[in-house]
Regions:
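ATP-dependent carbohydrate kinase catalytic cores
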Residues: 42-43, 49-50, 189-196, 200, ...
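Gly-rich Lys/Arg/Thr-decorated short loops/hinges at beta-loop-alpha junctions or inter-strand turns
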Residues: 23-31, 97-102, 111-131, 152-153, ...
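C-terminal, non-catalytic interaction/recognition modules in large multi-subunit enzymes and RNPs
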Residues: 15, 138, 142-146, 272, ...
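Active-site phosphate-binding/coordination module
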Residues: 77-126, 130, 188-192, 470
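Terminal amphipathic helices with adjacent charged low-complexity linkers/tails
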Residues: 158-204, 542-544, 580, 585-603, ...
Length: 672
C-alpha cells in the first residue's frame, strides 16, 4: 500500500485496554488494523497503527481513554478548588442518597480536591444573578499565593449562581492566569452553566483533575502525527483537540460513544431502527439502547463522581475478553472486573498465566488459534489449557466445564447490563435487535440473545473496529445549556425563543472561530422538564413544528413529558404542574462521510467451509464447519452449528440459529 496523502482519507482511532483500532476510509473503501495498546504511552500504539497502514496524513478523529483512565485510576493532577466562602465542603457533603442503600460499609470516593486544597472566597451572587457582595480581591491574592505554594497543578472555580452571572468566576480566571500562567484553570460557568452546585462543582473539579494529563497527551499526539486531530466527545460528536484539552470532561466516554454512533448508523443504513448495542472489548463491556434514536443523559456517575454534561446513555460492566477468572473468598467462580489487558494479556498470548474469557473461548473452540487477527497473531492453546486446568482443579471440574463456567458468569454480567438499560427504563428487549461489536462481542451474541428473548442479531462488516468507524464518521457537535426555571405561562414561548436564539448565535460564533463552514449547521433543541417539586428531570425534545403561542407549546411539551415519564417510571400525573428547568441546544455540523458499502451481488455459487473442527456449544462438542466471512455469498444461509471467522472477530452460530448476509455485507443471525 502506498503512503496515504492529505485530504484523500479519513482516519478513525480508538484506544482500548487491550488493542488500539485504526480504521482508514479512502476512496469509499475501508481498511482496518488492530495493534496492541501501549498503556505507558497510548500515543505510541496510535503511531504504530498509522505506520502499519502507511498513513502519513489525512483527517484524524480520535476516541481517547486518557480522561477515563485518569479518573478511574486516580492519577490526575493535584487540584485546588476555589468556591464561595462557606461552601468549601460541598464535595465532601454531596447528596443524601446512597448508591447502595443496604451496605453498611459503603465507601464514598475521596474528593478529588482534598480539604487543604479547597479555598473559600468572600463574594456572593443571588438567585437572580445579581451581585450582592463584591469579590474580595485581597483574599483572592492570598489564595493564589497559597495555591502557588502548595504545588497545585490545576485549579477549579465554582461559585454560587455563577451560571446566572459568571463575572466573579471570569475575574478569578483572569487573575490566576496573570499570576500563574502555567496553571491549568477551569471555571464552572464555562464547563456546566447549570444549577445544582454539588454536581456543577464535581464536574468542574473533574475537568481540572484530568485536564493537565489530557492536555499533555493531546500536545504529544498532535506533535507526533503532525496534523490537526479531532476528538470524540461522550455525547457522540467530535471537537477540536484544543477544546478537548480545555474541556476534557467531555471526553470521559469518548471511545464507547464512538461505538454507539457506529452501531446506530450501520443498523439504520440496513433498515434496522431499534438496537441494543453491546461493545465487548478486552477490559469491559459497554451496553446502550437506541429506540430509533441515540439516547442521551445529562446526569452521569463515573467511579462514584457525578458529572453533569451530555453523554450517550451507556452502562458499563467489567466484562471483557481480558477479564480475569478466579475463585473468590466464598469459593465461587468470579470473572472481572480485573483485566489482563494487552500486557501480559490472556494466558494464550504466551506471556502471563492469567485465566481470561479469551482463554475460555479458545478452549471451547469458539476462537480458532490460527485465525486470530486473520492469522497475524498466533494464540497458544496449550498455555491457555494449562492455566485453566489449575482453576478447574480448584473447583473440582474439567477444563472444559471450567471454561463453560467462565462464559456463563461473564454472560450473566452482560445480561444484567442489558436488563438495566432496557427493562429498567421501560423498554422490552424483545422489540430490539442485538448489535454486538468489539473484538469479543459476537462470540457471546447467540447466548445473550437467547437469555433475553431477542430473536435477531445484527453484525456489521467490521464489528471489531466499529468504535473507530463511529469516531471517524461522527458529526462535529457542541452542546450548550442554561438553567431557566420556568413554569409554563403566557410568555414561555418568547422566553425560550430568546434563550435559544442566544445559544444559536454563540454556536455560530464558536464554529466560525474554528474555521468551519456553518452553512449546513443544524440545531437540536431540548428541555429538561420535571413535575414541580421533583428533584430530577427528563430530557424532552423541543417541538419542531411551527408553534402558534405559549398555550400550544405548553400542551405539546406537557404531553411529551408525561409520555416519557410514564415509560420511564410507570406513571404520570396530569393534575401536576410541570417546570422547565434547563434549556439545551446541540449544534451539529453533519459529517459528509458516509459509511462505505460493499453492495454485494448475488452469486450462483456459495461459500464453502474452509475447515471442520469440534466446537463446544453449551456443554456439547459438535463437529462444526468453519467459514471465512468473505467467502459467504449474498443470502446464503449458514445454519448452526457453524463458526464464521474474520480479521477482527469470530462469530459462533449456535444450533437453532441461521446466519444470512445482506447486500451491504452485514450478517443477520436469527432464530430458526
Amino acid at each position: 500500500m502506498t503512503d496515504v496523502q492529505k485530504d484523500t482519507c479519513l482516519v478513525g482511532i480508538d484506544i482500548g485496554g487491550t488493542f488500539t483500532d485504526i480504521i482508514l476510509i479512502e476512496n469509499e473503501e475501508i481498511t482496518v488494523t488492530k495493534v496492541p495498546s501501549t498503556p505507558k504511552d497510548p500515543s505510541q500504539a496510535v503511531i504504530n497503527g498509522l505506520k502499519h497502514l502507511n498513513i502519513t496524513s489525512g483527517e484524524f478523529v480520535h476516541g481517547t481513554t486518557i480522561a477515563t483512565n485518569t479518573l478511574l485510576e486516580n492519577t490526575g493532577a493535584l487540584t485546588a478548588l476555589i468556591t464561595t466562602k462557606g461552601f468549601e465542603d460541598v464535595l465532601e457533603i454531596g447528596r443524601q442518597n446512597r448508591q447502595d442503600l443496604y451496605d453498611f460499609n459503603v465507601q464514598k470516593p475521596e474528593p478529588l480536591a482534598n480539604r487543604e486544597m479547597r479555598y473559600g472566597i468572600s463574594e456572593r451572587t443571588d438567585s437572580n444573578g445579581v451581585i450582592i457582595e463584591d469579590l474580595d480581591t485581597e483574599l483572592l491574592e492570598q489564595i493564589i499565593y497559597g495555591i502557588k505554594s502548595s504545588d497545585a497543578e490545576s485549579v477549579a472555580v465554582s461559585l454560587l449562581f455563577s451560571f446566572l452571572n459568571p463575572a466573579h468566576e471570569q475575574s478569578i480566571l483572569k487573575t490566576i492566569q496573570s499570576k500563574i500562567p502555567s496553571l491549568y484553570v477551569s471555571i464552572s460557568s464555562e464547563i456546566v452553566p447549570e444549577f445544582r452546585e454539588y454536581e456543577r462543582t464535581s464536574t468542574v473539579v473533574i475537568n481540572s483533575y484530568v485536564g493537565p494529563k489530557v492536555s499533555q497527551y493531546m500536545d504529544n499526539l498532535t506533535t507526533k502525527v503532525e496534523h490537526p486531530i479531532r476528538v470524540m466527545q461522550s455525547s457522540g460528536g467530535s471537537i477540536t483537540s484544543q477544546l478537548a484539552s480545555k474541556e476534557p470532561v467531555r471526553t470521559i466516554l469518548s471511545g464507547p460513544a464512538g461505538g454507539v454512533v457506529g452501531a446506530y448508523r450501520t443498523a439504520k443504513q440496513a433498515g434496522i431502527n431499534q438496537i441494543i448495542s453491546i461493545d465487548m472489548g478486552g477490559t469491559s463491556t459497554d451496553v446502550s439502547i437506541c429506540p430509533d434514536r441515540i439516547q442521551e443523559t445529562t446526569q452521569s456517575t463515573i467511579s462514584g463522581y457525578p458529572i453533569s454534561i451530555p453523554m450517550i446513555e451507556i452502562h458499563t460492566v467489567g466484562a471483557g475478553g481480558g477479564s480475569i477468572a478466579a475463585i473468590n473468598a466464598g469459593g465461587s467462580l468470579s470473572v472481572g472486573p480485573s483485566s489482563a489487558g494487552s500486557d501480559p494479556g490472556p494466558a494464550c498470548y504466551g506471556i502471563g498465566d492469567n485465566i481470561t474469557v479469551t482463554d475460555a473461548n479458545l478452549i471451547l473452540g469458539r476462537i480458532q488459534p490460527d485465525f486470530f487477527l486473520g492469522g497475524t497473531m498466533q494464540l497458544d492453546i496449550d498455555k491457555a489449557l494449562m492455566a485453566i486446568q489449575k482453576l478447574a482443579t480448584e473447583i473440582n471440574s474439567s477444563a472444559t466445564d471450567a471454561a463453560l463456567g467462565i462464559i456463563k458468569v461473564v454472560n450473566a454480567n452482560m445480561e444484567q447490563a442489558i436488563r438495566t438499560i432496557s427493562l429498567e427504563r421501560g423498554h422490552d428487549p424483545r422489540d430490539f435487535a442485538l448489535l454486538p461489536f468489539g473484538g469479543a462481542g459476537a462470540l457471546h451474541a447467540c447466548e445473550l440473545s437467547a437469555e433475553m428473548g431477542i430473536s435477531k442479531v445484527f453484525i456489521p462488516p467490521h464489528p471489531g473496529v466499529l468504535s473507530a468507524l463511529g469516531v471517524a464518521i461522527a458529526d462535529v457537535t457542541k452542546d450548550y445549556s442554561r438553567t431557566v426555571m420556568l413554569t409554563p405561562g403566557e410568555e414561555t414561548l418568547y422566553q425560550l425563543e430568546t434563550e435559544y436564539s442566544g445559544m444559536e448565535s454563540n454556536a455560530r460564533s464558536d464554529f466560525n472561530s474554528e474555521g468551519l463552514d456553518t452553512s449546513n449547521l443544524k440545531f437540536n433543541r431540548y428541555l429538561d422538564i420535571r413535575y414541580v417539586g421533583q428533584s430530577y428531570e427528563l430530557l424532552i425534545p423541543f417541538p419542531t413544528s411551527g408553534i402558534k403561542d405559549s398555550k400550544e407549546l405548553q400542551t405539546l411539551i406537557t404531553t411529551d413529558f408525561e409520555t416519557a415519564h410514564q415509560q420511564r417510571f410507570g406513571y404520570s400525573d396530569s393534575s401536576q404542574k410541570i417546570e422547565v428547568v434547563n434549556v439545551r441546544l446541540k449544534a451539529i455540523l453533519p459529517s459528509t462521510t458516509q459509511i462505505p458499502t460493499a453492495h454485494i451481488s448475488k452469486s450462483s455459487s456459495i461459500g464453502m467451509p474452509i475447515d471442520e473442527r469440534p466446537i463446544f456449544f453449551q456443554s456439547t462438542s459438535l463437529m462444526t464447519p468453519i467459514y471465512q466471512r468473505s467467502d459467504i455469498q449474498l443470502e446464503q444461509n449458514i445454519k448452526g452449528p457453524a463458526l464464521i471467522t474474520q480479521f477482527d472477530t469470530s462469530i459462533p452460530v449456535f444450533p437453532g440459529w441461521v446466519a444470512n448476509k445482506d447486500e451491504l455485507d452485514n450478517l443477520t443471525l436469527e432464530v430458526v
